[in-house]
Amino acid sequence: MDEFQTLKQNASWDISEDANDTPSLLVVILDANPASWYSLSKKVPVSKVLADITVFLNAHLAFHHDNRVAVLASHSDKVEYLYPSIAPEQKVAEVDPTKEANTYRKFREVDDLVLSGMKRLMSSTDKVSRKTMISGALSRALAYINQVQNKNTLRSRILIFSLTGDVALQYIPTMNCIFCAQKKNIPINVCNIEGGTLFLEQAADATGGIYLKVDNPKGLLQYLMMSLFPDQNLRKHLNTPNQANVDFRATCFCHKKVLDIGFVCSVCLSIFCEPRVHCSTCHTKFTVEPMSKKLHT
C-alpha cells in the first residue's frame, strides 16, 4: 500500500517556509479547438468536463481569500481571455445576478464567464482545424503573470488543459515561452485530456511542473484535485505524479514527424526530416553540395 501514500515518508517539513501565507495565482489555458472537443464528447459529455474544470477553479479561489484565477481560451486562430473579462459590458451581460443567490459571487462569475465564453467560441467556428494557438496563449499567460506580480506578491503557475496535438510551426515560439517560464520560476502544468503533445511534455519537465495524462476523462475532477491542486510550495511534501520517460525529440516543420536525427536551419533553427535547398521558414538558401558530400562520407 506504499504507492497509495500521499505524504512523503521522510519529508523535512520546514515550518518557517510553509507558514508563509502567500496567495497563489493560477493561470489556466483551455484548449478551445471545437474538433478536439467533438472527439472528446464521444467519451464524456463536454458539459461534464467544463463543470469539473470550474469546480477546480472555485476550489483554488476558496483555498485562500487572496487567491486569483485567470482563464484563457486557445482557439484554432486566436487567443481570448475568458476570465477576468477585459470588456466590462461583457462581464455585466454574461453574469446573471438572478442565478442561485446563495452562491459566492466570484464562483458564479467564474462559472458564467468561462462556460459562456467556451460556448461562444465553439459555436462561432465555421471551419474544421486541428490546431490550437498554444504558443500565443502561453505568451499572454506569461505577460499577465508579469503584470500582476509587479503589483502583488503571488506564487504563480500555469495549467494547460490540452486536447489537440502539437503544431510544428509553433515549436520555436513555444520553446521561447518555456525558457521564459523557466527563468521566472513559473511551473507549467499540463493536463492532457485528449491526444498527445511532446512540446507540452517538455514544458512541464523543463519548468518543474506536472504532466498528467488523463486516462479516464469521466474522473477529471479527481485527477485535478489529487494531482494539480497543490501549489509548488506544497508539492515538496507530496508524492506528485512524475515523468519517468520524457520524450525530448523534436518535430520536423515539413511533415510534422517526430525525429531522432534531423536537419536544422542555422539561421532560424527550423528542423527538417530531409535535406532541403532552402528553409521554408526564413527562406535561407543552403549550400547543397558540401552538405551532400558529408552525407555520403
Curated annotation (Swiss-Prot):
Record bears the keyword DNA-binding: no
Location of this chain's protein in the cell: Nucleus
GO biological process, one term: transcription initiation at RNA polymerase II promoter
Keyword DNA repair: yes
Gene Ontology terms, MF aspect: RNA polymerase II general transcription initiation factor activity; zinc ion binding
Pfam families, sorted: Tfb4
Zinc fingers classed as C4-type: ranges: 265-282
GO cellular component annotations of the record: cytosol; nucleus; transcription factor TFIIH core complex; transcription factor TFIIH holo complex
Biological role: Component of the general transcription and DNA repair factor IIH (TFIIH) core complex, which is involved in general and transcription-coupled nucleotide excision repair (NER) of damaged DNA and, when complexed to TFIIK, in RNA transcription by RNA polymerase II. In NER, TFIIH acts by opening DNA around the lesion to allow the excision of the damaged oligonucleotide and its replacement by a new DNA fragment. In transcription, TFIIH has an essential role in transcription initiation.
Cross-referenced NCBIfam families: tfb4 (TIGR00627)
Protein name (database record): General transcription and DNA repair factor IIH subunit tfb4
Protein species of origin: Schizosaccharomyces pombe (strain 972 / ATCC 24843)
Source species taxonomy: Eukaryota, Fungi, Dikarya, Ascomycota, Taphrinomycotina
